């Protein structure tokens, strides 16, 4: 499996993955944030590729000097195989390269089900934030 930056040729595969994995409402919100993040800094959109297939995606952003994991999605058939963990690890490295000192999980009603996954990574309650103001990639 390879974790790499999103490329324009990945767009259809990523959109299909998000539609498959996320609820309709969540997918709509995520696609808007995804497009904005791509226009601002595509290096913070990562894909997990296995045998030429996109099996996971992570959308990160930097907002007010903090790094945020906004959305992570992994194909169901590839869950519990380290895909999400690898995406998070690679994003944390990207944040470190940019001198981001605090990395947070942007928590919203759509990713509450991921809490056990994040707990398995050793994250603490202080690593989660439900911003009172929407992140720039969400607010537009």
Regions found by a protein language model. Give the residues of each.
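Active-site rim helix/loop that mediates acceptor-substrate recognition in acyltransferases
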Residues: 25-47, 59
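Conserved GNAT acetyl-CoA-binding A-motif
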Residues: 95-107
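A short, internal acetyl-CoA/4′-phosphopantetheine-binding micro-motif in the GNAT/acyltransferase core
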Residues: 72-79
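A short beta-loop-alpha structural element at the N-terminal edge
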Residues: 1-14
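Conserved beta-strand in the GNAT
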Residues: 47, 53-61, 68-70
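Conserved acetyl-CoA-binding loop of GNAT-fold acetyltransferases
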Residues: 118-128
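Conserved beta-strand-loop-alpha-helix junction that forms the acyl-donor binding cleft
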Residues: 105-114, 132, 136
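Conserved acetyl-CoA-binding loop-helix of GNAT-fold acetyltransferases
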Residues: 80-93, 120
